[in-house]
């Protein structure tokens, strides 16, 4: 099942049919068994598919209500190595090696819902940063009880130059206007997402590809319920929350984003999250 939040309402897509759901987003998705809950709406009259296609193509919003977005870091070996490389001159590389092997994961706050960009929107790079990358990440929707209910694609925009200068600058490297995008929908399977699921990214500059890559979830060191458990250990989220789970796709050190770049993040079952870097 795919659940879209659009300008004209909530649209559920399953088995080639689309259904309108008249409900607030928060109450709709914060369910103890979201897949079963959504299945109840498939007994209604399906939407005209051309109208549903138009609503999704022209009016898709970020699949978030009032939830917070959090993020996990250094969950893939590639990410650990990249963080160590960018911070070696400041002496911070030790911390990334240590957190990769530690029981406790790196978790940090990413964005409030009003700062989240949807597919088709613009993400930003900081004016005081010299080295910037997108981070394509499977993102979990976790209900208020701490159970993973759905998945979406996320882009954790990051300043490698600022974080590399000093690990304590991570909030500035990660949290700013236009630094977080989610979409295009919530993927709600009836079972946990497969560890063989592939995450892909392509970046185009003036129509030419400048970076592409893909990785499977089974390359992640941490388990998804493990990350959710740590986040909920001493935190409560009344309407649930979103958790980005880290990236294993890191461009080479010679690469940095530029205004006008088009970033496309694709995850099997979810679709494509596409954003343009703002001028």
Regions found by a protein language model. Name each.
Residues 160-279:
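Catalytic-pocket segment enriched in acidic/His residues
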Residues 20-30, 157-161, 218-221:
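A short local loop/turn or secondary-structure capping micro-motif enriched for an aromatic residue
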Residues 1, 127-128, 252-253:
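Generic recognition of flexible, low-complexity loop/linker segments
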Residues 7-8, 13-17, 142-147, 204-207, ...:
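Short acidic-glycine loop/turn motifs at beta-strand connectors
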């Amino acid at each position: 099942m795919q659940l879209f939040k659009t300008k004209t309402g909530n649209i559920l897509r399953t088995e080639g049919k689309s259904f309108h759901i008249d409900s607030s987003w928060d109450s709709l998705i914060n369910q103890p068994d979201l897949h079963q809950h959504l299945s109840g709406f498939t007994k209604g009259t399906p939407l005209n598919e051309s109208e549903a296609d138009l609503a999704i193509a022209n009016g898709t919003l970020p699949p978030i209500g009032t939830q917070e977005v959090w993020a996990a870091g250094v969950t893939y070996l590639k990410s650990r190595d990249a963080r160590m490389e960018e911070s070696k001159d400041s002496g911070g590389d030790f911390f990334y090696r240590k957190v990769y092997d530690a029981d406790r994961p790196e978790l940090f706050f990413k964005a409030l819902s009003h700062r989240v960009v949807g597919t088709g929107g613009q993400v930003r790079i900081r004016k005081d940063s010299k080295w910037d990358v997108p981070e394509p990440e499977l993102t979990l929707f976790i209900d208020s009880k701490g159970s993973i209910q759905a998945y979406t694609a996320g882009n954790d925009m990051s300043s490698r130059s600022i974080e590399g200068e000093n690990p304590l600058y991570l909030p500035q490297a990660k949290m700013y206007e236009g630094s977080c995008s989610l979409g295009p929908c919530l993927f709600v399977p009836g079972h946990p997402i497969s560890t063989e699921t592939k995450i892909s990214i392509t970046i185009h500059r003036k129509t030419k590809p400048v970076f592409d890559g893909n990785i499977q979830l089974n390359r992640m060191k941490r388990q998804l319920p493990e990350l959710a458990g740590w986040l909920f250990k001493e935190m409560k989220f009344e309407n649930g929350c979103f958790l980005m789970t880290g990236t294993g796709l890191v461009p080479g050190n010679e690469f940095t984003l530029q205004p006008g770049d088009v970033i496309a993040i694709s995850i099997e079952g979810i679709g494509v999250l596409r954003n343009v870097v703002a001028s």
